[in-house]
């Protein structure tokens, strides 16, 4: 796993040429559920307007862009790591593994992979060119698209989990460590879907 410093605007422009994939993750901070990553290859001949960091978009806008990405992108792949894998590996290494899985799931090998953040996972294909771009989800459209796909996929999984366990409020807080989530943990206990290595969950288990 390599660590990279911020690249320049000129470098960003150069990287966004040719057949490349953008990669981003969602769900490192929550106490429950998978960490989800996405890899997206956009079609330069079929642009998508309004792409941005998923956190800066409304849910309605994200959902609309998600459908447009699936319809227009050349390739979309989702990778994930389960709570069990997160507990075994730690969240950083689980995120890197999920990114590896997303890239491996692409139908065609890209010329390079551009990843939001300052780390690049060790790809199985050692010849694959990888670049970390700090705040890339707001700079590079393919990374923005990946952030939107990962966010919508994970949010919908939290909504499905909320249907199974409405007392935890997952549809509202999406599994993040909010006051409501802490209160639900205290009142109802730890679920199989919780990340047992995360401190609030671990402390609740130890208190039993």
Swiss-Prot record:
Signal peptide range in chain numbering: none
Keywords: Cytoplasm, Endonuclease, Hydrolase, Manganese, Metal-binding, Nuclease
Matches recorded under Pfam families: RNase_HII
Binding-site residues, a divalent metal cation: 24-25, 116
Root EC class: hydrolase
Reactions accelerated catalytically: Endonucleolytic cleavage to 5'-phosphomonoester
Subcellular location: Cytoplasm
Names of the cofactor(s): Mn(2+); Mg(2+)
Domain RNase H type-2 as annotated: residue spans: 18-208
The EC number(s) this enzyme carries: 3.1.26.4
Protein name in UniProt: Ribonuclease HII
Gene it is expressed from: rnhB
């Amino acid at each position: 796993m390599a660590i990279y410093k911020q690249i320049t605007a000129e470098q960003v422009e150069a990287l966004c040429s040719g057949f490349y994939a953008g990669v981003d993750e969602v769900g490192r901070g929550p106490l429950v559920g998978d960490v989800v990553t996405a890899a997206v290859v956009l079609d330069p001949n079929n642009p998508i307007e309004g792409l941005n960091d998923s956190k800066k978009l409304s849910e309605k806008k994200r959902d609309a862009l998600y459908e447009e990405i699936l319809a227009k992108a050349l390739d979309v792949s989702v990778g994930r790591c389960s709570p069990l894998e997160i507990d075994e590996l730690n969240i950083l290494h689980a995120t890197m593994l999920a990114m590896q899985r997303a890239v491996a799931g692409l139908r065609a090998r890209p010329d390079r992979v551009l990843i939001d953040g300052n780390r690049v996972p060790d790809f199985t294909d050692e010849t694959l060119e990888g670049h970390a771009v700090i705040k890339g989800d707001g700079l590079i459209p393919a990374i923005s698209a990946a952030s939107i796909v990962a966010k919508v996929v994970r949010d919908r999984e939290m909504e499905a989990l909320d249907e199974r366990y409405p007392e935890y409020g997952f549809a509202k807080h999406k599994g993040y460590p909010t006051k409501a989530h802490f209160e639900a943990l205290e009142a109802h206990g730890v679920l199989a879907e919780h990340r047992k290595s995360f401190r609030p969950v671990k402390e609740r288990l130890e208190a039993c």
